[in-house]
């Protein structure tokens, strides 16, 4: 039985929701307090037992490669000044074994995953999307990627992470048509549907950015026709795979943080900051004071006195 040791992280998107910042900085490098978002994804991979990581990048993504490269001058300066805690935090990213490949143009998630074919070979692997951060404020939780790996060890089948969303939001996701719950939280699936209309959605169980796939997915992606948004959709390829071999869905019951838009990015930053040992107390006091200030403004507004 082949073990799951490889992870693929697509990071070639243009990040248009965060312009103009992403004109010069990769979206995956936007910081949650003091760590870029991609750091949390890779941290989840390592905690799950992943040994080899491939990041699929595109143009203007050099900052990701720089983050995982050593910086001799900085490390020397920190060591000379005796700033060993900062040095340790810098080395967190340079001690990780990360490979890179470039997607020539953004043609969809399916095409990004296809760029990993030679890296993956004949092994099962996980795909981890950077817009979804899982349980980043709970270091005791079993990582979602680890849960998918455990499912694979039991079934030897591809398994996709899903989570309930509001029906009015299903058109932003791929969703599943569940057949039955074969064990606690693990579903057999009739179909995978990319971004359905709410009235046509087979369920509200949405795919949330963690996939464990068998290598047979690549032969499907090589001939996959463009789908929603005129892009090569990974969900469509998974639905095709499900017709020849079982693909399961694992319902995630932890805390998912969506960092794909400004509002949810800020919510994630606040939640994480309120757990950060260096700033949590000061931030908590500030948030409480700000809440009281906003209540006063609301009271004045409702009474007509500003």
Swiss-Prot record:
GO terms for biological process: capsule polysaccharide biosynthetic process; UDP-alpha-D-glucose metabolic process. GO terms for molecular function: UTP:glucose-1-phosphate uridylyltransferase activity. It is an enzyme of class 2 (transferase). Keywords: Capsule biogenesis/degradation, Exopolysaccharide synthesis, Nucleotidyltransferase, Transferase. The keyword Transport does not apply. Pathway: Carbohydrate metabolism; nucleotide-sugar metabolism; Capsule biogenesis; capsule polysaccharide biosynthesis. Signal peptide: none annotated. Its EC number is 2.7.7.9. It catalyses: alpha-D-glucose 1-phosphate + UTP + H(+) = UDP-alpha-D-glucose + diphosphate. CDD domains: UGPase_prokaryotic. The keyword Nucleotidyltransferase applies. Belongs to the UDPGP type 2 family. NCBIfam families: galU. This is UTP--glucose-1-phosphate uridylyltransferase. The gene is cap3C.
